Amino acid sequence: MPLCKRYVACLKNYAIMSDDVKKYTVEEERWNAVSHSVGIVGGLVVSALFIKEVIAKGGDGWALASVLLYMFGMLSSYTFSTLYHACSPASRWRKKLRKLDHSAIYWHIAGSYSPITLIAMRDVGYWGWGIFLFCWLCAIVGTSLSLYSLKKHNILETVCYVLMGLTIVVAMKQFYNAVPLRVFLWVVGEGVAYITGAVFYSFHKVKYIHTVFHFFVLLGSVCHMLAVWYVLNTML
């Protein structure tokens, strides 16, 4: 229960900080930017490997599209996060990049679901397409909230992030039965990494804690990359 309370506290803190951006030191922002720039480099390398794997395995158009959506979401998220943290607080681009940073989180989440739903679960009743459409609909709505009225809807935005992230729980049994065990375990590991990062994020007054949070986001991404790799490797 303490972990659950800490996670709830994190969500409340995130909503508050979305409205009044925390002022990080120059050194903190440097590390915040550097940490997610690692995600850009890793994402580019993995993108090439995944696309090559889909083509080599003779994957259909849906498989390729799902991987492209995943790569788009992940790279957009890390790119805008890096640019936002690297941008001077005095720059007129700072607020615009913040909106894009928040929007790209939706794309990252929806993109991450795409290979799982369009390859591993596409033929599992209506679950694959249902989750895919739900997540991308949430991403569209969430992007609108972030771009046009971020301050007014920061709590709603946080709820959208959480709902999207937990969508797979609704079809956990179907997902477990549809994929190899190691895929399931890597996705579980991803969830643990993100929740752990959220717990650390709740200590937002601690110096460099945002960089620590970024580390767990990267760890979650690595877990998901491995899950998708095994989906491509075993299910195409």
Please state what every model-predicted region is.
Residues C4, L11-L236:
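Multi-pass alpha-helical transmembrane bundles in non-GPCR membrane proteins
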